[in-house]
């Protein structure tokens, strides 16, 4: 932990949030047990990662209760402090959010990973209506909104625990406010309070089972197939090459959302595992796909397109992999999305600095395998994170190509707002690094109802029945996780 003198020196350099860090051994705990001890209340989060579908990432992140958060819907933003609105803004929320983020000047913590606090949460799909290059083409008609969640919700994370899964250590991070005369002392006291919480045992919420329920499609199979045929008509007319329609499923779910996260992380380990407690609703997900990642001046997108079910045996798994890589439709769709990714990254990157670093590799998850590629660029001077978001949002894999025309068709054919689905979840650090996953393989739990949404890439030779089945396959991990909870994880 830095000394009072070091703290004062950093304040003199103009930093208005200064991290105090305490390192402890926590090798007898897991990220889940630590979350139960330190957080497990509204406006907290747990972020984990599984690399390559088979090993946990080095770091996990627990956000302690956030006193400040922003909610944006349409052209209005509310800033909350301890549950009360303290600031409001009318107009495009994105410049306001960027200005809010930029209020905080913090020194880096060299011994820790790149994320050590900042804005954490999501940008829902309807964020598209705030980008000027989309707004003039999209109608933004009023649609049914069964979830009723904000378009954007971001927490200001100033107290967190960074878990090093390799060493078994936990780094407690509390940001002090040097504008407060006793800011340093208050942060030290808060660290001691958190240490006390760590020493205490926590009640383990057992999952003993509940009533079994079935998921019901909002769209319905036959209307969805008709939607696929309508999109194919647009494709044959030359309007577009691909569109990704989606359908939402819902089921009664009265169990703990944290139990759902336990089941999902076991069933479908993914690069982005996340649990967000927003009070009146929860987001639980295991997304395999980056929307965009910024690390200093490098930007990365990683398109995923092309899907097969996992095989029941290694031989069947290999056969499915070979079948996927020899499927002309899937390959053509994937190449189109690589080109779209190159175009998106190219808009914000220096000339000649865009490259495909992985091309059409197979990544395997619990229920499905995908074709994946990696596109990287070096940012032009002066690019902001909102410039990056504008260039890459929404993902081509969730919209289609050309992107704007595909989004117009989605607006026409889907019966309700997408909400969180198809948007982005993740972190925007104080250091301006950003890591956002696409909100897929993701459940929203609200009012004892679980919602999960999934899409299928429709091209000229798509079979409507196959595209319907693809939406079922992609939702399967979340629905099966919910059923595992209903059967009882701890029976």
Curated annotation (Swiss-Prot):
Name of the featured protein: Anthranilate synthase component 1
Domain of life, source organism: Bacteria
Catalytic activity: chorismate + L-glutamine = anthranilate + pyruvate + L-glutamate + H(+)
Cofactor binding: number and manner: Binds 1 Mg(2+) ion per subunit.
Residues binding Mg(2+): 333, 470
Pfam families membership: Anth_synt_I_N (PF04715), Chorismate_bind (PF00425)
Name of the encoding gene: trpE
Functional description taken from the UniProt entry: Part of a heterotetrameric complex that catalyzes the two-step biosynthesis of anthranilate, an intermediate in the biosynthesis of L-tryptophan. In the first step, the glutamine-binding beta subunit (TrpG) of anthranilate synthase (AS) provides the glutamine amidotransferase activity which generates ammonia as a substrate that, along with chorismate, is used in the second step, catalyzed by the large alpha subunit of AS (TrpE) to produce anthranilate. In the absence of TrpG, TrpE can synthesize anthranilate directly from chorismate and high concentrations of ammonia.
Species name: Neisseria meningitidis serogroup A / serotype 4A (strain DSM 15465 / Z2491)
Cofactor(s), names only, from the UniProt record: Mg(2+)
Enzyme class: lyase
Pathway(s) served: Amino-acid biosynthesis; L-tryptophan biosynthesis; L-tryptophan from chorismate: step 1/5
Residues binding chorismate, per UniProt: 306-307, 421, 441, 455-457
Protein keywords: Amino-acid biosynthesis, Aromatic amino acid biosynthesis, Lyase, Magnesium, Metal-binding, Tryptophan biosynthesis
PANTHER family hit by this protein: AMINOBENZOATE/ANTHRANILATE SYNTHASE, ISOCHORISMATE SYNTHASE MENF
Protein family per UniProt: Belongs to the anthranilate synthase component I family.
InterPro entries reported for this sequence: ADC_synthase, Anth_synth_I-like, Anth_synth_I_N, Anth_synth_I_PabB, Chorismate_C
Gene Ontology terms: biological process: L-tryptophan biosynthetic process
E.C. no: 4.1.3.27
Subunit structure: Heterotetramer consisting of two non-identical subunits: a beta subunit (TrpG) and a large alpha subunit (TrpE).
Keyword Glycosyltransferase in record: no
